[in-house]
């Protein structure tokens, strides 16, 4: 497993991520493995996912640098399909691909279930650093869509409070602006994909760069309500067919 980590670090700041990730890899790759030079570590899921929390934060509450998203509390099916997508090449991020290579589907489901069951508190939203007109454009797209361009509102799939919908549609609040923008941009540019029919790719293809910036600014500025949680499966009729009910 360690031999797989021969990838090149893209920039010096990523070194602070690489070193704890390297140290944490063994428990994830070899469940139950003991250290030969020290006492046995408890074989808990929390110990096994140390490679995940090295970047995604304690309990998966999000990395401090605004790039690594929150995992805690997201639908287990969503997390599971993202792990599959990284492992199988539908999402492109080399450290994740190396980390997950060779891990079986059943173990990925265990990881997904663990993080889905974490309910760490959300931090307050970042201060909106965008003009009022930009924020209004983002609000309109998120809550109303743009029928003339065939753009459904974000709430039509992601729920009235943008908390997602079971089994596999994620919430959109509590995420950093840069992460939201980069992921929608990846959909638009074909660097992120999902099981067909890929409804998010269809939506992202219709968004302009200004649309993406406005959505990212507005969504990241919204406080997370106390009732924030995924809606039950089938709570709303999706505006388009999505592979595996929105494996996004």
Residue ranges of model-derived segments:
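N-terminal secretory signal peptides that target proteins for export/translocation
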Residues: 1-15
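Bacterial N-terminal signal peptides
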Residues: 16-29
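Sec/Tat signal peptide C-region and signal peptidase I cleavage site
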Residues: 30-36
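Flexible coil segments in periplasmic/lumen-exposed cytochrome c-class electron-transfer proteins
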Residues: 37-49, 58-61, 94-166, 189-248
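The feature marks the first
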Residues: 39-89, 93
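Short cysteine/histidine-rich metal-coordination sites, predominantly Zn2+-binding motifs
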Residues: 69-74, 157, 170-178
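Extended intrinsically disordered, low-complexity coil regions enriched in Ser, Thr, Gly, Ala
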Residues: 75-97, 174-185, 189-198, 233-234
């Amino acid at each position: 497993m360690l031999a797989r980590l021969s990838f090149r670090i893209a920039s010096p700041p990523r070194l602070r991520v690489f070193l704890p990730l390297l140290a944490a890899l063994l428990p994830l790759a070899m469940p139950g493995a003991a250290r030969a030079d020290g006492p046995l570590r408890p074989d808990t899921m929390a110990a096994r996912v140390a490679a995940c929390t090295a970047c995604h934060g304690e309990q998966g509450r999000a990395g401090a640098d605004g790039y690594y998203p929150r995992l805690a509390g997201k639908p287990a099916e969503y997390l599971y399909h993202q792990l599959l997508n990284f492992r199988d090449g539908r999402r492109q991020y080399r450290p994740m691909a190396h980390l997950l290579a060779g891990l079986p589907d059943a173990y990925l489901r265990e990881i997904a279930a663990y993080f889905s069951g974490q309910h760490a508190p959300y931090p307050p939203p970042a201060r909106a650093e965008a003009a009022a007109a930009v924020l209004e454009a983002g609000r309109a797209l998120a809550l109303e869509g743009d029928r003339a361009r065939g753009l459904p509102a974000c709430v039509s799939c992601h729920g009235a409070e943008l908390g997602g919908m079971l089994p596999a549609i994620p919430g959109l609040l509590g995420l950093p602006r840069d992460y939201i923008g980069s992921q929608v941009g990846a959909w638009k540019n074909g660097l992120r994909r999902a099981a067909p029919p890929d409804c998010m790719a269809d939506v992202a293809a219709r968004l302009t760069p200004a649309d993406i910036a406005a959505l990212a600014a507005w969504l990241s500025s919204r406080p997370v309500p106390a009732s924030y949680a995924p809606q039950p499966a089938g709570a709303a009729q999706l505006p388009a067919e999505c592979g595996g009910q929105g494996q996004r």
